[in-house]
Structures are given as C-alpha cells and as structure tokens.
Amino acid sequence: MLQRKAYEHLVKWKNTPDKKALLITGARQIGKTYIIRKFAEENYSNFIEINFITNPDAAKIFNGDLNAETILINLTAYTQKPLVKGDTLIFFDEIQECPSARTAIKFLVDDGQFDYIESGSLLGVRYKEVKSYPVGYEENYRMYPVSYTHLRAHETRGNL
C-alpha cells in the first residue's frame, strides 16, 4: 500500500485522548473511503460504515430525538452489528446527504463510547440544511490526491 499522510493522521487521531469526531473532506475519488476502511481493518475489532448516498434510508437512524442513546439503538437496529465500547469505529460516508447526522455528532462524541469518522466531498453544498454544526466536536482534515512528488519518492524506493 502506498503510505499516505492521511493514514498517519488517522493513527495520530486514534491515539488522542478525549478525541473528537474526525471529518475528512476532499475531492471525489481520491481514496478517502479506501484509507478509512483500511485504517479501521487494522485498528478496530468492529467497524460500522454508513454511506448516505448508497443507503439513503439510513437517514432514519437520526429520526426522533437526537440523543446518543436513541441514535445508537437505531444504529444497532439498522446495521444488525454489535457495538463494542472502546473498540468500534463508526464511519459516516457522504455525510452531506444526512444533515441530521452532522448535527448529532456532538451528542455521540459527548457520549464517548465509540470513535467517529465522517467524510464527504460536497460538504458545502447542503450547509444550510444542518441545524447546528458540531463546533468543538469535530477535527477537520483535508485530504488531497497523491502528489507527483510523493508518488515519485515511493517509486524510487521500490515501494510501488
């Protein structure tokens, strides 16, 4: 695997005490979802992924009260997967498609049982639909395509 700066950032984020949700933004098709899946596979025993474009009905997880207990009950019912406290990564992909999920992050982070990563490529498009931004509950990370310099460095070391 081509080592990416984003992966190193994910590891650092995971090891941060009292971590916030990690919001990864960037252009489409640059590997955001791939790197998050790879990271989850190597660092967590449980991984739950919700893609709000391919599964628009997942938005119903956030119907009703936006408190952590209700959301986690709905999430477990929707995914039919167990949640292991302290060893589960919950990944909301294309979060711009579910403004309620973006609002709810603050309650989930406050609950502190699980780690959360959000990603999206068009986050600014629906910004007016988010009722309350999770200011202070998200760490933002901007991911970029692999640069020629980065690719060339790996090539000269025989890592490709």
Model features per residue range: what roles?
Residues M1-R152, R157:
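Phosphate-binding site recognition
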Residues L160:
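Cytosolic catalytic cores of cyclic-nucleotide second-messenger enzymes
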